């Protein structure tokens, strides 16, 4: 919204800098006001549409987080770079419904994927006998959402986590 207001002020400044010292009838100012009001309506509609889609996705998955794959198969370091570049995160389910939403992606694709488990996680879904540091220092989820220790060099499905703070 600030960008729209600054753009409007810039246009007015350009108008005045180009030798139009006056706007006796207020046509330029009124035009800028009309444009700004139109842009505000477009912004409100876009925000409403975005939130509607986000709420629908959240409702359908039972999670405020979205887990999305690009269908690539990569190791942990490549996953980290891909998710960072996409402005997402390596999946880190904190609740059972988030883990279920993550597992749904894995089940649909029939593949395993990496996740990150925080030190203070209130929710875990380790498979029997896990964690097993001998298997590796990374963590992967299977198609049922169970967590297993894994090598960080394994090539697994790329899944990134996205969430919104509004």
Swiss-Prot record:
It is found in: Secreted. Pfam families: Lectin_C. This is Phospholipase A2 inhibitor clone 03/12. One of its GO terms (molecular function) is carbohydrate binding. One of its GO terms (cellular component) is extracellular region. Expressed by the liver. SUPFAM superfamilies: C-type lectin-like. Glycans are attached at residue 122. Residues 1-19 form the signal peptide. Disulfide bonds join 83-160, 138-152. Residues 46-161 form the C-type lectin domain. This phospholipase A2 inhibitor binds directly phospholipase A2 in the presence or absence of calcium. Keywords: Calcium, Disulfide bond, Glycoprotein, Lectin, Phospholipase A2 inhibitor, Secreted, Signal. Belongs to the alpha-type phospholipase A2 inhibitor family. Homotrimer; non-covalently linked. The keyword Repeat does not apply. Gene3D superfamilies: Mannose-Binding Protein A, subunit A. Its main location: secreted.
């Amino acid at each position: 919204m600030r960008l729209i207001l600054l753009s409007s002020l810039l246009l007015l400044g350009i108008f005045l800098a180009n030798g139009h010292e006056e706007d006796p009838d207020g046509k330029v100012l009124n035009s800028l006001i009309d444009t700004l009001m139109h842009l505000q309506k477009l912004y409100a509609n876009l925000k409403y549409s975005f939130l509607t889609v986000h709420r629908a996705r959240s409702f359908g998955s039972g999670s405020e987080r979205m887990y999305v794959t690009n269908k690539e198969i990569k190791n942990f370091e490549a996953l980290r770079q891909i998710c960072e570049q996409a402005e997402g995160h390596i999946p880190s389910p904190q609740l059972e419904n988030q883990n279920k939403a993550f597992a749904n992606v894995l089940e649909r694709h029939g593949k395993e994927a990496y996740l990150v488990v925080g030190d203070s996680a209130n929710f875990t879904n380790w498979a029997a006998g896990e964690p097993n540091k001998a298997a590796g220092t990374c963590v992967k989820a299977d198609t049922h959402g169970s967590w297993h220790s894994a090598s960080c060099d394994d090539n697994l499905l790329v899944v990134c986590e996205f969430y919104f703070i509004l």
